[in-house]
Amino acid sequence: MSQKRQTKFQNGKSKTSENSSAKREKGMVVNSKEISDAVGQSKFVLENLRHYTVHPNLAQYYKPLKATALQKFLAQNRKNTSFMLKVTQYDQDKTLLIMTNNPPPCSITQQDKESASKYFSKELLLKVMESHHQHKPTENLWLPRMPQKKKLRSKLKPIFPLILSDDPTSKREQWFRFSTDNDFKSEGKYSKVYALRTQKKMYPQLTFAPVHERDMRKDASKKSASERPISKVIREPLTLASLLEDMPTRTAPGESAFRNGRAPQWIIKKATVIG
């Protein structure tokens, strides 16, 4: 009997294992949480997954970031740089076109002399050719030079004598010299006028006296101060002992050394009345 029961129990175990493996292969749901695929790898799925499958459009709840002052400055700088680059390229193309059509004359080579006619009208060139053939027919064809005006010395600049240490009798002249004390006789008033202007800008509602009147007042105050009698009494600085004689110490209740203002009422025990 025992052998029959053991065989039945083993057969039951094998059947349950086969059933469980068959369920896993078919993809059965266990406890509403585990789903197995054909391979046998389990995946855990949320119970309320259907509520999260469709994501809401959250862009409507956010505002776009505003550009800062630095970003605006950099963007404007890029625009200006690109515009200047385009203008420079356009100028280069125009210059190349002009130089190709009208090459400049060169005095080194003979071939470039013929290109000078592109810069001047035919009438002017005919006049130049006639004048050159009449006076100097053998010379090459060149345009006349512009008349140069001589640089005349301005009469406003004075001339100072120059005395050399080697030869004191030599007579030379120069337009400059070192300044001496005799050149600075007037008092400088630039700083005073500048200070008055700044004061007028800062306080436009006030009226300021002229500079010469203020100078007169200062001179008068200096004279009055000098005329005052000066006392010859020798004064000494106050000491702590002399201060304690006139102002006695006042004791007040409290815990700390400096009282810290904890006393609700200051009770003066000793006081002297100074008449």
UniProtKB/Swiss-Prot annotation:
Tissue-specific expression: Testis-specific.
Coiled coil (residue ranges): none
Top-level taxon in the UniProt lineage: Eukaryota
Regions of compositional bias (Polar residues) in chain numbering: 1-20
InterPro entries: TSGA13
Residue segments, region Disordered: 1-28
Protein name (database record): Testis-specific gene 13 protein
